[in-house]
Swiss-Prot record:
Keywords: Cytoplasm, Pyridoxine biosynthesis, Transferase. InterPro entries: Aldolase_TIM (IPR013785), PyrdxlP_synth_PdxJ (IPR004569), Pyridoxine-5'_phos_synth (IPR036130). Homooctamer; tetramer of dimers. PANTHER family: PYRIDOXINE 5'-PHOSPHATE SYNTHASE. The gene is pdxJ. 3-amino-2-oxopropyl phosphate binds at N7, R18, S192, G213, H214. Belongs to the PNP synthase family. The keyword Transferase applies. Its EC number is 2.6.99.2. Catalyzes the complicated ring closure reaction between the two acyclic compounds 1-deoxy-D-xylulose-5-phosphate (DXP) and 3-amino-2-oxopropyl phosphate (1-amino-acetone-3-phosphate or AAP) to form pyridoxine 5'-phosphate (PNP) and inorganic phosphate. The active site is at H43 (proton acceptor), E70 (proton acceptor), H191 (proton donor). This is Pyridoxine 5'-phosphate synthase. It is found in: Cytoplasm. Pathway: Cofactor biosynthesis; pyridoxine 5'-phosphate biosynthesis; pyridoxine 5'-phosphate from D-erythrose 4-phosphate: step 5/5. It comes from Nitrosomonas eutropha (strain DSM 101675 / C91 / Nm57).
Amino acid sequence: MIALGVNIDHVATLRQARGTDYPSPIKAALVAEESGADAITLHLREDRRHIQEEDVIILRERLKTRMNLESAVTEEMISFACRIKPHDICLVPERREELTTEGGLDVIRHFDQVSAACKRLTEAGIRVSLFVDARADQIDAAIRVGAPVIELHTGHYADAATSEAQQAELETIRSMAAYAFSRGLQVNAGHSLHYQNTTPIAFIPEITELNIGHAIVARALFIGFAQAVREMKTLMQEARA
Ligand SMILES: CC(=O)[C@@H](O)[C@H](O)COP(=O)(O)O
Ligand SMILES: NCC(=O)COP(=O)(O)O
């Protein structure tokens, strides 16, 4: 069984486009849970381009599965997370001008900052995941800072220019998932996964959970959110069958 974390960021993107109170990310999260989501992922960005603090506060009380809060490693976000106490937090890199996440967290370069954040969050009872590129040195650093979970960045795989390049990225993800799993980490994966590229990632036996959002929200425009979630969950389970 491989778990699906549904990222609801881009339901909030549509809401923020006009500053209305619809579509509701809260409603989307509850529908996703009813449709097979094992967790709800939401990224509280520093620029609040989509998810707002209020969304996190409300959902923390309403979710029946798990909240996986994504955030940058900043004092503001770590303090907020320690107050809200999501089940999981995934620490991600952020650049204000980025269109979306561009790569994994550089745990090596920001070792002391990430280590201190991991300690604070763990002491607050929150399970810490680090969003990293599929590289052994970053995985080793994640272990050294005490994170029990990593999320492998699948963006380079998803955005590969040729099928050969995509196959090479897939092999890297496969080998790094096995590397991390053999060293005691829970291995998740995500970013830019969709209905045509998820199966090979879901097939990797060491991967416990996929976090997928943009593609589900996009498909929901045509078939509804419940069906879009169900289809992705089914696709993932079939990959493991
Ligand atoms: C870390 C990651 O890949 C996503 O979970 C992240 O939320 C992407 O950022 P946007 O949702 O703002 O595109
Ligand atoms: N961490 C990846 C995630 O939560 C969803 O990313 P995407 O599917 O919106 O690209």
